[in-house]
């Protein structure tokens, strides 16, 4: 847990980036206004987390999940954000699923490559053994001819 109230503030760089993305080009914001928005955002996050935690506790869980956050948004009377949040959550889940599938495919491809390399190595070893046998047979034949 935070030891000082300042520890609860969101990073200034993040707040500044969000503000710049939200404002039209050419619009500036004072340091004081940026600080006020930062504090307001921090309070909002803390309040939303507290509300979501209440839903988790009702469900006898210690871990907050997305449905807790969505329920908290409704309880805080931010219903108009629920649909965009659900859409963002679905996009996030699709992205994570795609990453997971890509990772699994990469692992399968790597395993196939490793298996193929092992088969090639085994074939090479078999060929080396065959060559050694042929050389040995040739030497034996030469020795027999000499005898």
UniProtKB/Swiss-Prot annotation:
InterPro entries for the chain: CBFA_NFYB_domain (IPR003958), DNA_Pol-Epsilon_Subunit (IPR051377), Histone-fold (IPR009072)
GO cellular component: ATAC complex; CHRAC; epsilon DNA polymerase complex; nucleoplasm; nucleus; pericentric heterochromatin
CDD domains: HFD_POLE3_DPB4 (cd22928)
Gene Ontology biological process terms, A to Z: chromatin remodeling; DNA damage response; DNA replication; DNA-templated DNA replication; heterochromatin formation; leading strand elongation; negative regulation of transcription by RNA polymerase II; nucleosome assembly
Biased composition (Acidic residues): 125-147
Compositionally biased spans, kind Basic and acidic residues: 93-124
Subcellular location: Nucleus
Tissue expression remark: Expressed in heart, brain, placenta, lung, liver, skeletal muscle, kidney and pancreas.
Regions annotated as coiled coil: 85-146
Primary location class: nucleus
UniProt keyword terms in alphabetical order: Acetylation, Coiled coil, DNA-binding, Nucleus, Phosphoprotein
Span list, region Disordered: 93-147
Modified residue annotations for Phosphoserine: 122
Modified residues (N-acetylalanine): 2
Residues bearing PTM Phosphothreonine: 83
Role description: Accessory component of the DNA polymerase epsilon complex. Participates in DNA repair and in chromosomal DNA replication. Forms a complex with CHRAC1 and binds naked DNA, which is then incorporated into chromatin, aided by the nucleosome-remodeling activity of ISWI/SNF2H and ACF1. Does not enhance nucleosome sliding activity of the ACF-5 ISWI chromatin remodeling complex.
Record's subunit section: Component of the DNA polymerase epsilon complex consisting of four subunits: the catalytic subunit POLE and the accessory subunits POLE2, POLE3 and POLE4. Interaction with POLE4 is a prerequisite for further binding with POLE and POLE2. Heterodimer with CHRAC1; binds to DNA. Component of the CHRAC ISWI chromatin remodeling complex at least composed of SMARCA5/SNF2H, BAZ1A/ACF1, CHRAC1 and POLE3; the complex preferentially binds DNA through the CHRAC1-POLE3 heterodimer and possesses ATP-dependent nucleosome-remodeling activity.
PANTHER family tied to this protein: DNA POLYMERASE EPSILON SUBUNIT 3
Protein name: DNA polymerase epsilon subunit 3
Organism: Homo sapiens
